[in-house]
């Protein structure tokens, strides 16, 4: 059994008493309120049962991160020599629509729900780039991608060309960690995620770019270099709402979901929460890089 499979990580956490099964027949705002209350020492990851289960607080504690990483983040540094990606045959996926996903608003002032754990993979000069950007759905065929100035994706868009992307939602923590970390512009994040995985991270081939084996949702699309739409507002980590601003249009080409998959989302807040835990883990990780 491949232990870094997203579902297997959840099973390990469940067996260790780190998860709670919840009634999913509530609003996203109620889910978020419960998730924020659970962000405390001894708090659990919450799995809200519905047609597509929603999992919150998955990586909202160092203990759960260590289960996913098989050790503390601080001990993992990329190898000086990165290796070619290793591939496995994929599990079964089915085609779905973006609107089939339970993308729910978490706060009263949110303009809508958003995909906020998506690892957005692109390629430049033969190198895989990966960043985590908020994605606001507009329809089954269009969304807005919050690629903030100076982000890897924004820098690629400066060339004036549309950018094909693959978005991995519900994926390996190693890729999530590299996606939220500040790494050199020429870093191949897929290879770095592999290098910090015990026995290596396994990938699957898709219609575009590779994603980790066991990724729950795979979205293919194209980020427009010319078309923008107004994104937001959303509650951000400062406790304030983002100002509505124009960001690039993401044209959706396909959405696939693994059989019996989960929808992984995180809740943003001013107190201790999953987004803060991820940023702290990224800081420890990049501190290790600087120390090499």
Could you say what each language-model-derived stretch is?
Residues 1-292:
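Non-catalytic, beta-rich accessory domains that mediate macromolecular interactions or localization
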């Amino acid at each position: 059994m491949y232990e870094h499979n997203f579902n297997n990580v959840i099973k390990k956490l469940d067996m260790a008493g780190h998860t709670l099964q919840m009634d999913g027949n509530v609003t996203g705002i109620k889910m978020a309120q419960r998730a924020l209350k659970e962000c405390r020492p001894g708090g659990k990851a919450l799995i809200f049962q519905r047609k597509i289960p929603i999992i919150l607080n998955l990586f909202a504690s160092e203990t759960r991160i260590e289960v996913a990483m098989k050790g503390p983040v601080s001990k993992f540094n990329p190898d000086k020599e990165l290796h070619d990606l290793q591939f496995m045959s994929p599990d079964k996926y089915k085609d779905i629509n973006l609107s089939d996903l339970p993308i729910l608003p978490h706060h009263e002032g949110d303009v809508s729900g958003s995909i906020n754990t998506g690892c957005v993979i692109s390629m430049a000069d033969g190198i895989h780039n990966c960043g985590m950007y908020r994605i606001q759905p507009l329809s089954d065929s269009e969304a807005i991608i919050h690629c903030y100035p100076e982000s890897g994706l924004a820098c690629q868009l400066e060339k004036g060309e549309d950018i094909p992307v693959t978005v991995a939602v519900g994926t390996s923590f190693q890729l999530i960690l590299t996606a939220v970390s500040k790494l050199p512009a020429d870093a191949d994040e897929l290879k770095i995620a592999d290098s910090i995985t015990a026995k290596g991270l396994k990938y699957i081939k898709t219609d575009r770019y590779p994603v980790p084996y066991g990724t729950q949702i795979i979205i293919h699309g194209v980020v427009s270099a010319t078309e923008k739409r107004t994104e937001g507002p959303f509650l951000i980590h400062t406790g304030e709402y983002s100002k509505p601003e124009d960001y690039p249009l993401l044209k959706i080409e396909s959405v696939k979901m693994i059989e019996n998959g989960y929808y992984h989302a995180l809740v943003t807040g001013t107190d201790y929460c999953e987004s803060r835990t991820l940023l702290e883990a990224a800081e420890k990780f990049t501190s290790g890089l600087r120390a090499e």
